[in-house]
Amino acid sequence: MSKKNVNKETITEVALEILHEKGISHLTMRNVAAKLKVKAPALYWYIKNKHELLQLLADYICSLISIPKRKDDWVEEIFELSNNIRSVLLSIPDAAEILMDTLPVTRERLLLIEKTLEIFHRANFPEDKIFFTVTYINTYVTSYVLDEQKQQKLLDEMGTEAIRQKFITSVSDISKDDAPYIHHHFKNPDSGLKNKEDFMLGLRIIIVGIQREIGE
């Protein structure tokens, strides 16, 4: 790839390659420039620093999220949108961390927020509850995926069986008399692994709380 090919699109493409190959710890201006076969200063025409690089990636990530078709039930729309967000974040290493480390000030990200706000306006939510509700759901989805991605890194680094045995050994070292609930809930080491079912359960609990708050 020659210098004349350097633009925001190719910078994004190369940054994504680095994320998939080595993760966010290796995502630097120097490494992006090296993959583009240019010197780091050549990137400054498009992005000034790593923060702007992350902003670029965050906007790209948000552009991949499908907005659900309008439904009569706002809950169904939020379930579908939340699942769409989770799926996209899980498809890109460290995507949740990137969203958490950047400001929601880019076009695609603001449009995603706009569409989410629209769902609650159409549902005639109390005006003073809309922004809080959107923020709270966004925090839950992003935090859940961040936990999933950190968990997956541990599984990749240590191995599922090694982690399972560590849990079994650690729990066995504590008597049932001292920690009966630990023994009860940690009988199956796999029970703590994040999955879609647990994600949806948490989201449902949040939705029920929101419905109660607005008296629905």
Task: Give the positions of each predicted feature.
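Residues in the recognition helix of alpha-helical DNA-binding motifs
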Residues: 46-47, 133
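Key DNA-contact positions within bacterial/archaeal DNA-binding proteins
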Residues: 30, 39-42
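Basic, helix-initiating cap at the start of DNA-binding domains
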Residues: 1-22, 26-31, 35, 47-55
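C-terminal peripheral helix-coil segments that are non-catalytic and often amphipathic
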Residues: 122, 150-216
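Hydrophobic alpha-helical connector segments
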Residues: 67-111, 115, 127-130, 134-137
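Short hydrophobic clusters on alpha-helical segments that form packing/core surfaces
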Residues: 11-19, 57, 61, 85, ...
